[in-house]
């Protein structure tokens, strides 16, 4: 170029790159990597969900501590588990410890997934409700352990026959314990159920005769104990009434509960054939457990021997 030539202006790039060199976009590569990571994680989660983990639970590990759960604050069931842990489990070659958990669903999920070895929280019909509501849970009742104290409570009367016409009576609001309450009232001679009805699935609609025209109110465990002063009677678990400060003298009828309502040692199905779980079941079947239930004041009137 000569000194007299006028420089030809350089045309700006079509897209202003502010002086930086424009390179090919990396966005497709980044998206591809993200998709790959998501697929790998999803596959791993699915593999774990179908039992693909190499990690062993305490249920299948020799010498591990086997946790037996019930609800936090349940002193009677805790006392039973701690008795088994101290006095019975060593005879069966295992180590057992108590674990308190928040509620039924949390307990049963922990059993199903092997976070705890077992629970003594429930009877078979309650377990059936849980499994119906949570079809992914894999649990089963391994052996009956005790019967819960269960009775007819009243602030106003001392015998079921004293209940007046149109008496207000409460049953529990969950299906299994509603059925247990109706069985109980039939035993007391206050109602009869329709012929052929499955008594363990009965509801108030299955009542055939009700001579006193009892008026039923369905309440949950805590609400029922609070409502007792406003009721003529209520059918419920002794432990809830004692915990609420209601005297055992208010329990006016208390026959032994049927086998269907025995408290069960519930285990995770996946581990039922492991040595640890077999030994745990044997520990809860040990005769010393029934002797404890007969004699220990911490479980009196609450957990009854079979």
Task: Please tell me what each predicted stretch does.
Residues 149-160, 261-276:
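A bilobed periplasmic-binding-protein/Venus flytrap-type ligand-binding module shared by bacterial periplasmic
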Residues 129-142, 157, 230, 235, ...:
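Ligand-binding "clamshell"
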Residues 82-83, 87, 105-119, 183-184, ...:
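Short helices/loops that flank or line small-molecule/ion binding pockets
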Residues 44-45, 176-189, 195-201, 284-306:
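Ligand-binding clefts/hinges and TM-proximal coupling segments of bilobed small-molecule sensing domains
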């Amino acid at each position: 170029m000569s000194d007299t030539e006028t420089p030809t202006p350089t045309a700006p790039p079509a897209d202003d790159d502010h002086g930086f060199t424009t390179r090919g976009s990396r966005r497709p590569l980044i998206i591809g990597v993200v998709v790959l990571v998501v697929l790998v994680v999803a596959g791993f989660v699915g593999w774990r969900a179908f039992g693909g983990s190499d990690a062993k639970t305490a249920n299948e590990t020799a010498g591990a501590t086997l946790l037996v759960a019930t609800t936090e604050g349940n002193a009677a069931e805790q006392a039973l588990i701690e008795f088994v842990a101290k006095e019975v489990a060593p005879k069966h070659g295992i180590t057992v410890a108590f674990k308190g958990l928040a509620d039924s669903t949390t307990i049963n999920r922990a059993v199903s997934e092997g976070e705890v070895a077992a629970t003594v929280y429930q009877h078979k019909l309650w377990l059936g409700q849980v499994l119906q509501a949570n079809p992914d849970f894999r649990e089963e009742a391994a052996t009956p352990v005790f019967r819960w104290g269960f009775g007819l409570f009243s602030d106003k009367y001392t015998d079921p026959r004293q209940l007046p016409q149109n008496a207000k009576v409460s049953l529990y609001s969950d299906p299994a314990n509603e059925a247990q309450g109706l069985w109980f009232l039939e035993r007391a001679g206050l109602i009869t159920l329709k012929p052929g009805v499955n008594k363990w699935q009965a509801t108030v609609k299955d009542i055939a005769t009700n001579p006193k025209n009892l008026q039923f109110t369905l309440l949950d465990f805590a609400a029922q104990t609070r409502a007792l002063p406003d009721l003529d009677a209520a059918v419920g678990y002794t432990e809830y009434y004692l915990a609420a400060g209601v005297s055992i003298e208010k329990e006016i009828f208390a026959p032994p509960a049927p086998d269907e309502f025995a408290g069960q040692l519930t285990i995770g199905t996946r581990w039922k054939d492991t040595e640890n779980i077999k030994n745990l079941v044997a520990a809860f079947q040990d005769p010393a457990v029934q002797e404890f239930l007969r004699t220990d004041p911490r479980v009196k009137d609450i957990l009854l021997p079979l």
